[in-house]
Amino acid sequence: MQIHPLDTEEIGLKTLEKHLIRTHTQKQLHVGVPKEHSVDEGRVSISPGGVRILSANGHKIRVEQGAGADAKFTDQEYSEAGAEIVESTEYTFDQADIIVKVAPLTPEEMTWVQGNQTIISALHLGSQEEAFFTNILK
């Protein structure tokens, strides 16, 4: 029997796509989005679209009231996307597994960080003093 290279799919295995049922065994993350307090910072770390995606995957998002105002996102947009709107920066940090910011942590915000939290933000290495790094390592 002679096999031609273009005819090999006839003797090979054919695959069938199958949808897998996913169970919700993944960890639910609590994400805090504080308002940026720097005068020259108009960005926010997560848009309402990002909140919608995270919420749809079972994560809890806390956004500080007015956090998206300078970026032209309203609290209502965040709320409709699935975020809980909170009144204070301190409460944004409370019970959060992850804190996401654009600017580096302020000295006041560092006092609210708990040992088990992950901070995602810029560091601005060139403008930080030694005390910043000492506090962040605690």
Regions found by a protein language model. Give the residues of each.
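Structural/interface elements that position substrates and couple domains in central-metabolism enzymes
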Residues: 1-134
